[in-house]
UniProtKB/Swiss-Prot annotation:
It comes from the Bacteria. Stealth proteins are part of a protein family that is conserved from bacteria to higher eukaryotes. Family members were first identified in microbes as proteins that help pathogens to elude the host innate immune system. Microbial stealth proteins are involved in the biosynthesis of exopolysaccharides. Stealth proteins are predicted to function as hexose-1-phosphoryltransferases. One of its GO terms (biological process) is polysaccharide biosynthetic process. One of its GO terms (molecular function) is transferase activity, transferring phosphorus-containing groups. The keyword Secreted does not apply. It is an enzyme of class 2 (transferase). Keywords: Exopolysaccharide synthesis, Transferase. Residues 251-271 are annotated as: Disordered. Its EC number is 2.7.-.-. This is Exopolysaccharide phosphotransferase SCO2594.
Length: 602
């Protein structure tokens, strides 16, 4: 898909031209003409990129003779990338570290891994005295498998400045650098996902001062280590919060967690070679598991449709039974893909359904469990239910669920790497994300949208429980960081309202919204959560004008940690168009299956 929002010129226009001026232009220039201009720019950029890729391919035919290599475009720059089926950011990080350390071991060069400030790149320390041997070893590795190098100073290196390390000239540029980064670009089979310098490995040259090796730059742990100190092994989760905790880790394909890597002489899988200072667990390190819970409904299931029809004569508000609310656009499939890509630290995933299972779901995956409403509802007479407020009120009853967990709606996706601390601090405190949208004042009534009515009820309960404290704001549509203990307290403290919500088959004016609002305000008042501001978030109602343009920007920029694709306005006649629009976008953003899909490993 050619994205008219992707070219750099379009991005520069938005950054340079003030919002007011852009509005004036929009008022006086036909939208169709503006779209034609952007499409023309996109076509020219695509042609330029193609020419550059062909030029590189012709210049390096031998390097590209293998089927698992291809030329990709990163910004304006063509790069030789290694095709890794279903590669993830954590995979790219691990692979670059493995490539560097294997080259060093093969050359007999001592090294140790360093904990750096980055969660995506790695860092390896070598002795300054070994500089010539290090450069020779890595230069040879980059000739065999084409890689790139760049000196590292302040700030994150830019992909367009990376130097092709399969030539001789670039090594002269980095030969005297205290730190340089070595990267082998990775891409998936489609070429749409490219993992570049952000996931590379920094080589730090530590010099000797007396009995110590001293770092050329600061790091979060130790700037000097004893020269004669023995190396040790440490879990990779000590070096990046992207990695799962040791007890939550499952083997990669063909990997034995109990076996050493005898052939290469390296550390066991999941471990890295380091020094004792870097193997120590820090005070700020997370030690508790985090699970994910989804609620899902198959709105096309004939049995479910018949059941819903039996109870849906008089929904109190048109949004309460809006067809778009129950329509499955396969958002769950893509949300799980986003979780696999950008939150590999999650332990288990629970999918709560009305005895429904997507036919594409890999229910044999060890991290995934489908949970029936029947397993969690305290009162069986409340079923069947078609009320998300009711279902959400029962999530803490899931057997085996961790104390700290994230609640995802299936229309919520991760758009880039997220970390546990975006949701929970290492001491267990949760973070919630306030929306600028306000809860209306007044008593709930039949004219209120369901979210407004529930917000009003939440407001009353918080004021009564915590001495007149008034809540004003709604929450953003992000993964909700929840505590089971808080949900249990809400069920006890607000027993009547909780029971009434659980028993309401459709959203009603008497509902409370437990997971998406009430929990956060209750947890705040009891010292277990606080307002967060770390997530870059985008919300889009796909039924509104301009949705295609906004989706194009999301795809081009990939800067949002979280985005939500909601639909509160589409009529049934508009759903087919919205379906096509969303599917096209999501296939581009998440182009390959996750392990949670059947046949993903075929």
């Amino acid at each position: 898909m050619r994205n008219p929002e992707a070219p750099r010129l379009v991005g520069v226009y938005r950054r340079v031209v003030p919002v007011g001026a852009r509005r004036v232009i929009a008022e006086h220039v036909d939208s169709g003409f503006r779209q034609q201009v952007k499409e023309g720019i996109a076509a020219a950029a695509a042609k330029r990129d193609q020419i550059n890729r062909v030029r590189v391919a012709r210049s390096h035919r031998k390097l590209l003779a293998r089927h698992d290599r291809r030329v990709v475009s990163v910004g304006k720059a063509p790069r030789i990338a290694h095709v890794v089926p279903r590669a993830t950011p954590l995979d790219a990080r691990r692979a670059n570290l493995d490539d560097v350390t294997e080259a060093l071991r093969h050359a007999g060069i001592d090294y140790f891994c360093v904990r750096s400030a980055s969660e995506t790149s790695t860092a390896v320390a070598v002795r300054e005295d070994d500089r010539e041997h290090v450069i020779t070893a890595l230069r040879q590795a980059c000739r065999v498998r084409p890689g790139y190098v760049i000196p590292v100073g302040k700030g994150e290196p830019l992909d367009e400045a990376a130097l092709p390390a399969f030539g001789t000239g670039p090594w002269k540029r980095v030969s005297g650098s205290p730190v340089f980064r070595c990267t082998w670009y990775r891409t998936d089979e489609t070429g749409r996902m490219v993992f570049g310098l952000r996931y590379g490995c920094d080589i730090e040259f530590w010099h000797q001062e007396g009995g110590e090796l001293v770092s050329p730059r600061r790091n979060p742990v130790a700037e000097a280590v004893p020269v004669e100190e023995e190396a040790t092994e440490a879990d990779e989760s000590l070096f990046t919060d992207l990695a799962p905790l040791p007890e939550d880790r499952i083997p990669r394909a063909g990997e034995d967690l109990d076996a050493g890597d005898g052939a290469a002489g390296g550390p066991r899988p999941g471990l890295v070679r380091t020094r004792p200072a870097f193997a120590a667990g820090s005070v700020g390190r997370r030690t508790f598991p985090i699970d994910v819970v989804y609620t899902w409904v198959d709105g096309s299931d004939p049995a479910w449709i018949r059941s819903r029809a039996e109870f849906s004569d008089r929904p109190y508000h048109e949004e309460a039974a809006n067809a778009a609310r129950y329509l499955s656009r396969d958002e769950l499939r893509y949300s799980l893909r986003s979780l696999n890509l950008y939150a590999p630290w999650v332990r288990n995933i629970y999918l709560v359904t009305a005895d429904q299972t997507p036919d594409w779901l890999n229910t044999d995956h060890p991290r995934l469990k489908v949970v029936s409403h029947k397993e969690i509802f305290s009162e069986p007479t409340s079923l069947p239910t078609f009320n998300s407020h009711a279902i959400e009120s029962q999530l803490h009853h899931i057997d085996g669920l961790s104390e700290h967990f994230l609640y995802f709606n299936d229309d919520v996706m991760l758009g880039r790497e997220t970390l546990p601390q975006h949701f929970f601090l290492p001491n267990g405190l949760g973070q919630y994300y306030l929306s600028p949208a306000l809860i209306p004042f007044g008593e709930p009534n039949s004219e209120d949208p369901p979210v407004a009515a529930a917000g009003k009820n939440n407001r009353r309960l918080i004021a009564e429980r915590f001495g007149g404290s008034t809540i004003f704001r709604k929450m953003k549509h992000v993964p909700h960081a929840l505590h089971r203990g808080v949900l249990e307290a809400i069920e006890t403290d607000f027993a009547d309202e909780h029971r009434r919500t659980a028993a309401s088959r459709f959203r009603s004016a008497g509902d409370i919204s437990v997971t998406s609002s009430l929990h956060h305000y209750y947890a705040f008042h009891t010292g277990r959560s606080f307002p967060g501001d770390q997530l870059v978030y985008r919300y889009l109602d796909v039924g509104k004008p301009g949705a295609e343009r906004v989706l194009g920007r999301l795809l081009a920029e990939r800067e949002a940690h979280v985005f939500c694709l909601n639909d509160t306005t589409s009529t049934e006649s508009e759903l087919a168009h919205q379906q096509a629009l969303m599917t096209r976008f999501l296939d581009e953003y998440f182009p390959f299956p996750s392990p949670y899909e059947r046949g993903a490993d075929d």
